């Protein structure tokens, strides 16, 4: 009888701890600034989407395989507005992204080699977008969409052609609804 009582108490204690942890997480999210929410909740999901799109590809900057990040051509510190645009985020090795300050010269060369000069110029053009001024609720809504997109992409993770990778970036940028259409879609004329 005592053993059954102890098991019951343990289950109740575990449930209370779990509920408390969930409440703490919700409170922490509520107290986050809008930019902190973008950086810690939404940005990792967007970066993972870019990595899934580029699945099977080597680092855009140094051509290596291994531990990968979603690296930004235009750094987030330099321009927050382009931080969530998938055309600005490509698979990049951890080493190139972190220890070589983004490796921007080789990143540029890699974009041109993979997708062409017109695409690179489009990525540069993204910097002309006006500031986003998204609210935290906007970011929460975008996070929900991005999470669903990420899950669907994971179900069909395979190597894609350069054209398919650009098309996916076009489609997903539009689905997320963050940017004006001309900043979402690249089409070679």
What kind of feature is each model-predicted range?
Residues 41, 45-62:
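Short, well-structured hydrophobic secondary-structure segments
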Residues 123:
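Catalytic cores of secreted/periplasmic lytic hydrolases that degrade extracellular macromolecules
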Residues 66, 88-119:
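Short Cys/His-centered divalent metal-binding micro-motifs
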Residues 1, 60, 94:
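Cys/His/Pro-rich metal-binding microdomains
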Residues 101-105, 126-128, 133:
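Non-catalytic accessory segments of DNA primases and related replication-initiation nucleases
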Residues 1-45, 131-189:
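A boundary/linker detector
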Residues 51, 60-91, 100:
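Histidine-centered nuclease catalytic patch
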Residues 38, 42, 81, 99:
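Conserved aromatic-histidine-acidic binding/catalytic patches
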């Amino acid at each position: 009888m005592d053993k059954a009582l102890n098991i019951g108490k343990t289950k109740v204690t575990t449930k209370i701890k779990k509920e408390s942890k969930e409440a703490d997480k919700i409170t922490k999210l509520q107290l986050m600034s809008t930019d902190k929410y973008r950086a810690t909740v939404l940005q990792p999901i967007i970066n993972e989407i870019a990595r899934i799109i580029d699945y099977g590809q080597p680092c855009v900057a140094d051509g290596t395989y291994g531990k990968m990040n979603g690296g930004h051509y235009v750094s987030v510190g330099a321009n927050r507005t382009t931080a969530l645009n998938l055309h600005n985020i490509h698979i990049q090795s951890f080493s190139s992204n972190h220890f070589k300050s983004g490796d921007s010269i080789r990143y540029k060369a890699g974009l041109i080699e993979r997708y062409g000069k017109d695409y690179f110029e489009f990525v540069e053009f993204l910097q002309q977008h006006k500031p986003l001024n998204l609210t935290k609720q906007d970011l929460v809504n975008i996070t929900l969409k991005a999470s669903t997109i990420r899950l669907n992409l994971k179900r069909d993770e395979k190597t894609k052609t350069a054209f398919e990778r650009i098309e996916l970036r076009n489609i997903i940028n539009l689905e997320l609804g963050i940017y004006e259409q001309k900043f979402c879609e690249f089409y070679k004329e």
